[in-house]
Amino acid sequence: MFLYFGINGVLLLFAYLLIYLLEKTFGFISNVTLVELSDINSPVLRQLSEICPGTFQHSMQVANLAAEAAIRVGAKSQLVRTGALYHDIGKMENPAFFTENQSGGVNPHKNLSYEQSAQVVISHVTDGLKLADKHNLPKAVKDFISTHHGLSLIHISEPTRPLYIS
């Protein structure tokens, strides 16, 4: 009886090692890893909360809404929640250029042309991918970062520019 208990304990430890090896070898991502990544005390999310508190709150709200939507349509809610938490980490490179992080009525976009301003805003996606690489985030999470504004060209038309860039 105790022998089975011991064997099962050893097999359980090997299962965790096997999960890790499968993830690294074949690019799988387990719910165990997703739960670890979605811990708001993880290094990247803690840094996001300190550098971009508005973006962090936005990401938390998006994660909650997206996870609920995923549950209702039968998608992988833990993956969606984790991806949503990380989708805007690129904003840490230029936090003051995003309205959710601005305070004191200072808007750095006022000193830039529309094109320069748009480039700063759009670059948060590539900046996010660089941070994701630096922190070894899984490809599934990187996919949320790279596609959260869609796959088409972002265009702000002349008449609506004042609405987006004040």
Where are the regions that the model predicts?
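Single conserved hydrophobic/aromatic residue that forms the stacking wall/gate
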Residues: 155-166
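A short hydrophobic/aromatic micro-motif that marks alpha-helical segments and, especially, helix-coil
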Residues: 102, 152-153
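Acidic/His-rich, divalent-metal-binding segments that scaffold phosphate/diphosphate chemistry
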Residues: 2-120, 139
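A short structural micro-motif
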Residues: 89, 151-152
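An active-site-proximal "capping" alpha-helix that borders the catalytic cofactor pocket
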Residues: 63-70, 124-137, 145
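Structural motif
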Residues: 75, 135-136, 166
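Cytosolic nucleotide-binding catalytic cores of signal-transduction proteins
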Residues: 142, 146, 150, 157
